[in-house]
């Protein structure tokens, strides 16, 4: 691949943060007695139209009717949190995740990630022996945990992935951090993206850091220590111009085979949304064995199965090509990697402005389900060596690919 010094992007305007807007919906009680209310938001979140708390339900004894209420709430609100789930075992977490896609059974990356030493995901995942679809993630030494005798966890740090990291001095003395890598949970090769991801906070250290974008926007915001950041793909779509929406509706994105191995040596932009194009991607001859038939191509817009809304969903760090199906029946292929990255970055960047990013403030016992086909998310924060973070993560490679816009959707644009 030819080397290019950088990725050209349109810099977003600096935003003045003001007080929070009204909640995106009014709290309600479902027919099964579940209480659904908006997540609390900090003052700078003036344009977060998603997120809900769900209470008054026993997840260990979930009826079909109660699950249907949860399913509907998830597809309407994209991220739902069940507080105080301290006694939720991995078996139940897997069972709940599985109910969103009963024909799925394999972990979203196929349980092969920890066998690929040169994958950027390799250090971050440890499978629970009794429930291989559930992963142990976090930071610090964990002993005698659901069949794992002793594991040393490492919270992903932007210094291992960004080209120009924050100095250690700023990080330690000023408590400055960054977005690590904006992504959807997906293998992007051989497997379909999971419908949902579930996360259980077993132990979540508390604190506050300042998250800085460092992308010439001047954007920064306070974030809870180790927060998971979420941005709405629906809002990203809404922010496109009418012409961009028409093109996006006919656009597909092809991903690298073994994408996380391919980009292992490449480095990310400071806001974690995309990559510098410097010719550091591995050549396909250097990858583990792969087959063209297993390379994944997905629509740029993914359709919500309940609301019918369109979300702009892509993993820009791992994209190889853009394919645009023209109205005359031809297909335009964009395979210049810097251009591919520039297009996807500029589509997504307005959607991660501080006013639009929900950073979940994890408390012990929080059980979060997020719609992996409606939001993109990102790790934040940095932990000290003496801090221990323990989370259980579960997502399942879907039995079906994401649905794109229908012909009726495209005709209505």
UniProtKB/Swiss-Prot annotation:
Keywords: Cytoplasm, Dioxygenase, Iron, Metal-binding, Oxidoreductase. It is an enzyme of class 1 (oxidoreductase). Its EC number is 1.14.11.48. Disruption phenotype: Leads to cells defective for the utilization of hypoxanthine or xanthine as nitrogen sources, while being still able to utilize uric acid or allantoic acid. InterPro entries: TauD-like_sf (IPR042098), TauD/TfdA-like (IPR003819), TfdA_dioxygenase (IPR051178). The keyword Oxidoreductase applies. The lineage of its organism: Eukaryota, Fungi, Dikarya, Ascomycota, Taphrinomycotina. Binds 1 Fe(2+) ion per subunit. Residues 1-24 are annotated as: Disordered. One of its GO terms (cellular component) is cytosol. It comes from Schizosaccharomyces pombe (strain 972 / ATCC 24843) (Fission yeast). Alpha-ketoglutarate-dependent xanthine dioxygenase is a non-heme mononuclear Fe(2+) enzyme that decarboxylates alpha-ketoglutarate to succinate and CO(2) while hydroxylating xanthine to generate uric acid. Allows xanthine utilization as a nitrogen source. This is Alpha-ketoglutarate-dependent xanthine dioxygenase xan1. Coiled coil: none annotated. The gene is xan1. It comes from the Eukaryota. It is found in: Cytoplasm, Cytosol. Fe cation binds at residues 183, 185, 377. Residues 1-18 have a biased composition (Low complexity). It catalyses: xanthine + 2-oxoglutarate + O2 = urate + succinate + CO2. Its cofactor is Fe(2+).
């Amino acid at each position: 691949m030819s080397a290019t010094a950088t990725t050209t992007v349109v810099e977003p305007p600096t935003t003045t943060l003001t007080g929070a807007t009204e909640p995106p919906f009014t709290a309600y009680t479902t027919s099964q007695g579940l209480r659904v209310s908006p997540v609390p938001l900090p003052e700078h979140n003036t344009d977060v139209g998603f997120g809900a708390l769900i209470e008054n339900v026993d997840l260990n004894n979930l009826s079909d009717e109660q699950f249907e209420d949860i399913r509907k709430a998830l597809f309407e609100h994209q991220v739902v949190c069940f507080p105080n789930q301290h006694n939720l075992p991995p078996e139940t977490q897997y069972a709940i995740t599985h109910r969103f896609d009963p024909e799925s059974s394999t972990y979203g990356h196929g349980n092969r990630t920890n066998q690929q030493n040169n994958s950027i995901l390799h250090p971050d995942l440890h499978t629970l022996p009794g429930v291989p679809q559930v992963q142990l993630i976090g930071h610090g030494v964990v002993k005698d945990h659901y069949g794992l005798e002793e594991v040393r966890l490492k919270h992903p740090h932007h210094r291992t992935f960004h080209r120009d990291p924050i100095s250690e001095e700023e990080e330690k003395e000023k408590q400055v951090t960054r977005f690590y890598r904006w992504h959807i949970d997906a293998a992007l090769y051989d497997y379909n993206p999971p419908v949902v991801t579930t996360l259980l906070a077993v132990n979540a250290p508390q604190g506050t850091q300042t998250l800085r974008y460092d992308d010439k926007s001047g954007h920064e915001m306070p974030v809870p220590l180790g927060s998971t950041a979420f941005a709405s793909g629906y809002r990203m779509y809404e922010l496109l111009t009418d012409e961009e929406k028409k093109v996006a509706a006919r656009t597909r994105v092809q991903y690298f085979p073994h994408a996380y191995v391919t980009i292992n040596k490449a480095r990310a932009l400071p806001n974690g949304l995309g990559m510098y194009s410097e010719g550091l991607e591995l050549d396909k001859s250097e990858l583990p064995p792969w087959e063209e038939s297993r390379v994944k191509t997905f629509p740029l817009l993914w359709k919500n199965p309940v609301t019918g809304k369109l979300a702009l969903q892509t993993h820009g760090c791992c994209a190889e090509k853009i394919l645009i199906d023209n109205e005359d029946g031809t297909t335009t292929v964009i395979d210049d990697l810097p251009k591919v990255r520039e297009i996807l970055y500029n589509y997504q960047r307005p959607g991660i402005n501080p006013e639009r990013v929900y950073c979940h403030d994890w408390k012990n016992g929080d059980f979060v389900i997020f719609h992996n086909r409606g939001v993109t998310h990102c790790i934040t924060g940095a932990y000290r060596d003496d801090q221990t973070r323990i989370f259980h993560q579960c997502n399942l490679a879907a039995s079906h690919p994401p649905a794109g816009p229908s012909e009726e959707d495209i005709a209505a644009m």
